[in-house]
Amino acid sequence: MEEKHLTRAILIGADTGEYDAESSMDELSELAKTAGAEELARVLQKREAYEPATVIGEGKLAEVKELCGSLGAELLIFDCELTASQIRNVEDETDVRVIDRTMLILDIFAGRAVSREGKLQVELAQLKYRL
């Protein structure tokens, strides 16, 4: 029996006090498992507000970059919605693919779609979201 490769992922969140960040990260972990990701680590930073360029601060981003190298991470999953520039900035800094919570959920739907119409609808939703 062939063993399925799990994508090695680090979960990242910024706790601004707006919601229960720990519960949200637990839910993100379950979503990641459903999508076929192996959680290597969680990084949760308490912040007054999101850093506009990267969501998390410069020092925490450097810590994430180190974790990526030492743990062999292939994916960073953020527990919030990211802009295209935030994704690019974090990817440029870490050399690791970055997705957000919504992209993760759309990936789960894409993996479960069976009919041609269902697959096209999910693909359309993914493309619209990435715009």
Please report, for each region that a protein language model flagged, where it lies by residue.
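N-terminal accessory targeting/assembly segments
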Residues: 1-107
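Extended, highly charged alpha-helical segments
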Residues: 93, 104-131
